[in-house]
């Protein structure tokens, strides 16, 4: 009886995961902040996929201007703000104002707001000037943008990157909006990027890219 109950529970969880994943593919949109906070701060998730993996290909950020698109509740941006140091600046943008508020609260608690700028805006039209960023970071967020606008979002990321800048994208398979690596490579090339490096481990990958014409 217990075995049957356990199998039934696993089956229900499996069906629930499939339903969430299918819905994420058919109706891409930002994850609600309450769910995002649980998902991004969950110790089990952080132990396997945390800021270290997300920023592995970003290089030394000391003194740089680094933008994260889709900050969520600020887990990755907090680490970025620490890494840029007092001589650098971290920036974050999210379309959800409550996510930006959570991020501001998190960074304020760690004394990092003096080196951080936040904005509530669409990833397709960001408030920063052309070539103003050294790095742009996107973590499990491109899939939240409707399919027809993903290349446009990548081009907007390229717009704010300076001539030596680097775009770093990380995807985590359990995320309902996961984009597979081959598809991500195609999207980047369509947006005018060339691939610099790829890091992979089970369930996740990170890819870095530069705008076409840059010396890699």
Language model features with spans:
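Conserved SAM/SAH-binding beta-strand->alpha-helix loop
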Residues: 96
